[in-house]
Amino acid sequence: METATRTTYNGWANRETWNVSLWINNDWVAYEQARGFMVDYKGRTPFQDFVDAYGYISTPDGVLYNDPKLSKRELNSMMRELL
């Protein structure tokens, strides 16, 4: 009998991606900034462009917004779903 390997964290690619999404969606200031940013956004990489525009460095609990483990694909999708 094979054992399934857990490959996600709460439905996200990993803990870091989940954590960043959690903070953007649950911190009122970050959420409002992200929604406002997306209103007129026409680019292809909304997550990175948002982080760069607002100078985000890390979540309050220490996950870096430029952590190489982040799934940019998932975070870009999350940003597009804010509207």
Role assignments for model-derived ranges:
Residues 1-83:
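Acidic interaction surfaces
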